[in-house]
UniProtKB/Swiss-Prot annotation:
Listed name of the protein: D-amino acid dehydrogenase
Domain of life from the UniProt record: Bacteria
Cofactor(s) for this UniProt protein: FAD
InterPro entries xref list: DadA (IPR023080), FAD-dep_OxRdtase (IPR006076), FAD/NAD-bd_sf (IPR036188)
Pathway: Amino-acid degradation; D-alanine degradation; NH(3) and pyruvate from D-alanine: step 1/1
E.C. code: 1.4.99.-
General function of this protein: Oxidative deamination of D-amino acids.
Major enzyme class: oxidoreductase
Protein source organism: Salmonella schwarzengrund (strain CVM19633)
Length: 432
């Protein structure tokens, strides 16, 4: 089958890889000059299935009001003048109760855990290298309340069979030795030993090269004007004076998916602006071993080979990509506070990207009412974590194979008022 994939970020490229491996003739189209040039370029670098959770959580509406008056707030909102933004925020608020949070987190963890398994299989099969580490992730708590609240997420981890360790402050240095100097600032942490890290852009570029060698065609520097459709199917992609035709089409344009699908399929994917710093390491012993998540500021600090990646924050501001100095100062403040000897901050590279977010935090993966149009978008801050699983899942569905995990509650159909999902199976039962 001829398949056109729109988008060459980590989600688009993994989709291309798995579809090609399934025997399809795949073409990837992107306006950029190469893969992973936008949202996948400089994300936080963490592959953290157990920490997969929606921003829409109990208490967030009240916290958002408080954050409006804080200099280093993890979330900021500025009206962009569109009704879509208001509708999206209203939908997000409706998901901020405990029932929706647990439901959304459960399916996010399900996909993320599966994705990590797919990444391991891919790594073993191809030998792909991307400065990856399998050292786990440590979420740090600065208050007793945060430590206490961790029990809510632990229930989901236990249900999914995700190994975890709840650590008191005195034990944090056992897994991250550099934290010994700042343990007095912390109340404890939640460690997920099976989590991983890695350079998402490097992974995407190398997998794209492997995919090309396997027969995938990449059409870079090719802006897409619109999808052409008639009745219940897509019949082409208009790119300038050219119409590119295929048997099936996959939308993986991230935050730009919503506009490209206007009038075709209504999907609630909105750009969530985030920032990162990439810092050269000065003293390896003063840098993190793997990934640290600061629960207070919602910032991740990740170790690559000779660099530290500091990323996080969320701005609901539309498609604005201005680099704001106060956001850089927040990233610098957190990394200096936790790893004062780790990196040469003055030589850091400052970056911003737009994460494609749904109101419930769960990506949109699967078929649409158009028989040859498929979606793989809306992964928010977890595109790197969920990319391989989403790509394999999409390939299985499109190819008519039975996927390894339940998936109907990942489709766009879940936003219909009459949608009733099949109850997902329990993944595992063991934990430590």
């Amino acid at each position: 089958m001829r398949v056109v994939i729109l988008g060459s970020g980590v989600v688009g490229v993994t989709s291309a890889w798995y579809l090609s491996q399934a025997g399809h003739d795949v073409t990837v189209i992107d306006r950029e000059s190469g893969p992973a040039q936008e949202t996948s370029a400089a994300n936080a670098g963490q592959i953290s299935p157990g920490y997969a959770a929606p921003w829409a959580a109990p208490g967030v509406p009240l916290k958002a009001i408080k954050w409006m008056f804080q200099r280093h707030a993890p979330l900021a909102v500025r009206l962009d003048g569109t009704p879509f933004q208001l509708k999206w925020m209203w939908q997000m608020l409706r998901n901020c109760d405990t029932r929706h949070y647990m439901e959304n987190k459960g399916r996010m963890v399900r996909l993320a855990e599966y994705s990590r398994d797919c990444l391991k299989t891919l790594r073993a099969a191809t030998g792909i290298e991307y400065e990856g580490r399998q050292g786990g992730t440590l979420q740090l708590f600065r208050t007793a309340q945060q430590y206490e609240n961790a029990t809510r997420d632990i229930a989901v981890l236990e249900d999914a069979g995700v190994p975890y360790q709840l650590l008191e402050a005195s034990r944090l240095a056992e897994v991250e030795p550099a934290l010994a100097e700042v343990a007095h600032k912390l109340t404890g942490g939640l460690r997920l030993p099976n989590d991983e890290t890695g350079d998402c852009q490097l992974f995407t570029q190398r997998l794209a090269r492997m995919a090309e060698q396997a027969g995938v065609t990449f059409r870079f520097n090719t802006p897409v004007e619109k999808l052409l459709y008639e009745n219940d199917q897509i019949y082409g992609v208009k790119c300038a004076d050219e119409i590119i035709k295929a048997d099936a089409y996959v939308m993986a344009f991230g935050s730009y998916s919503t506009a490209m699908l206007k009038g075709i399929v209504d999907i609630p994917v909105y750009p969530l602006k985030g920032y990162s710093l990439t810092i050269p390491i000065v003293e390896p012993d003063g840098a993190p071993v793997s990934t640290i998540l600061d629960e207070t500021y919602k910032i991740a600090i990740t170790r690559f080979d000779k660099r530290i990646r500091v990323g996080g924050m969320a701005e609901i501001v539309g498609f604005n990509t201005d680099l704001l100095q106060p956001r850089r100062e927040t990233l610098e403040m957190v990394v200096r506070d936790l790893f004062p000897r780790g990196g040469h901050i003055e030589q850091a590279t400052f970056w911003t990207g737009l994460r494609p977010m749904t109101p419930d935090g769960t990506p949109v993966v699967g078929r649409t009412r158009y028989k040859n149009l498929w979606l793989n978008t809306g992964h928010g801050t977890l595109g790197w974590t969920m990319a391989c699983g989403s790509g394999q899942l999409l390939s299985d569905i499109l190819s008519g194979r039975t996927p390894a995990i339940p998936y109907d509650d990942l489709s766009v159909a879940r936003y219909r008022s009459d949608f009733t999902p099949t109850r997902p199976q329990r993944l595992h039962s063991a934990h430590n």
